[in-house]
Amino acid sequence: MAKTSAKSIRPGELNLKEKLVHINRTAKVVKGGKRFGFNAIVVVGDKEGHVGYGLGKANEVQDAIAKGIEDGKKNVIKVPIVKGTIPHQIVVKYGSAKVMMKPATPGTGLIAGGAVRAVLEMAGIHDILTKSLGSSNPHNVVKAAIKGLQYISDAYDVGERRSKSLSDVFES
């Protein structure tokens, strides 16, 4: 598995939307009681093949979400989409979270749960079958889904790596 080449994507040129995946409240015990903080994991995307995620931490929920959105815009990747789905099946593990993604025929819909669904919706994938195995921690599940989308390559990428034309790729 080879990561797709990281071409510079300028998030300012994209019409990015954001989706909040998870908010977590943390507590620090101090002399006077408990001091609460928040962290938010946010997925950003243009629903046309660009997606990213960000983690924001702050003392207020809105500040954490805003920081997460800014972080997500810095981590945008390009996803190859073929006829509303992914070109091939992939299984990816991040930490203890394992995500399996399979291409589906048009009309199947987006069959995914929770955090993976948010990532795929923001990427603009309409027909896909997914299964989240192992840990259900939203942080690791989102990272596994993004990692999987990074490793997906279409026929053009395969042809470039092998220095072959598109017809040669399909013959072999």
Curated annotation (Swiss-Prot):
The gene is rpsE. With S4 and S12 plays an important role in translational accuracy. Located at the back of the 30S subunit body where it stabilizes the conformation of the head with respect to the body. One of its GO terms (cellular component) is small ribosomal subunit. GO terms for molecular function: rRNA binding; structural constituent of ribosome. Part of the 30S ribosomal subunit. Contacts proteins S4 and S8. The N-terminal domain interacts with the head of the 30S subunit; the C-terminal domain interacts with the body and contacts protein S4. The interaction surface between S4 and S5 is involved in control of translational fidelity. It comes from Chlorobium chlorochromatii (strain CaD3). Belongs to the universal ribosomal protein uS5 family. This is Small ribosomal subunit protein uS5. Pfam families: Ribosomal_S5 (PF00333), Ribosomal_S5_C (PF03719). Keywords: Ribonucleoprotein, Ribosomal protein, RNA-binding, rRNA-binding. Residues 16-79 form the S5 DRBM domain. One of its GO terms (biological process) is translation. PANTHER family: MITOCHONDRIAL RIBOSOMAL PROTEIN S5 (PTHR48277:SF1).
